[in-house]
Amino acid sequence: MFKWAQAALANVAGTKEPIYGPEAIRSVAEEAKTTPYTETTKDDLKWQAMESTCVETQCFYFMTDSGQLAFAQVIYSNVAGIRTTCQFNCKVFSLDGSKPHLWCSTPLNNHEFSEDKTSFYATDCAVELSEDGNSYTIKSLNDERSIVNVTIKRTAPGFKIGTSGTTLFGTDLANPWGSMRHVFWPRCVAEGTIATPDGPVDCKGRAMFVHALQGMKPHHAAAKWNFCNFQGPNYSAVLMQYTTPPSYGSTVVNVGGIVKDNEIIFAGAEGAVTHVAIKGDTENDWPEPTAIKFEWKGTTKDGKQADAVLEGELEDKLDRIDVMAEVPGFVKQIVAGAVGTKPYIYQYAPQKKKLTLKLKLGEEEISEEGYLFSEATFISA
């Protein structure tokens, strides 16, 4: 009970959590031992909209046929059950560095959900799941610099790892005090536009969607993150890795998979991420990576051992985000007061040389070049 009270205090006051140890986390990898993944249904896409501390997001990544990169994101956040805030973010990257990235982050008013919780609405904003559960339409008029009207349709099944997609946190895991959940649509097609001051961005091309829920303070759940979104002509690969703070035993959790049109090749919790080379960031002491290796392991539906590797130079980072300087005030409230917390996100999309996804499915070997969008996030040491 005392530890639960400490956790409750840490959630409200931003104090540092005590050391609970690895026994205070049940990784989704435990579920994945017997059920590596489950294909998503419409129910999996419902907003949880928790009434306790949480950050819940739906994020849509666009890799356009014309070679542009962008994302749109809705964030729902609750601080200690006291205040709920929603935000719409849109970013259009300047891949050649000739101009600043377009970054628009707008607080939303009058948010609500559809009756079945699968669609989100606010003033001048709508993120709607179609009746058949296979496509989303994202519309935002909240910032005249980025007027979004895009539809994505999945071309492969979505998945969650294990049966729930969820890692639980707490000393009594039957009554957890925290959670982390991810649901993916790794391979989609997009159409529509983002109207910007430099003209419309035609989003026709590939897309990826992830619905994430951190049912606790973000810096309590993870000390660092790695994210891979790879899109090739025939294959898509996604990997999300997070490492908990020492309070939960610095536990590493990997969730990801490889898909092609109409089929999940394999998915599970046996991935790995290695920062093959780092140069370090002189401004904040974080070990900024310059080369990376993503790995996936699993079993195909017909029982073949499956492995995949994506490795290469990250080239110059696209962006470095000082989270505390850029995130909305409500997220700062969640992180405020946390000792040793200085979150930075490093974003990459190698342009000079495409990376190659190397698949081994049983005896069959497949290599495919494609486009990578990757993030390395450092929150606390």
Swiss-Prot record:
It holds the Pfam family Svf1_C. It is found in: Golgi apparatus, cis-Golgi network membrane; Endoplasmic reticulum membrane; Cytoplasm; Nucleus. Its main location: Golgi. GO terms for cellular component: cis-Golgi network membrane; cytoplasm; endoplasmic reticulum membrane; nucleus. This is Ceramide-binding protein svf-1. One of its GO terms (biological process) is response to oxidative stress. It is a peripheral membrane protein. One of its GO terms (molecular function) is ceramide binding. Residues 1-18 are annotated as: Peripherally associates with membranes.
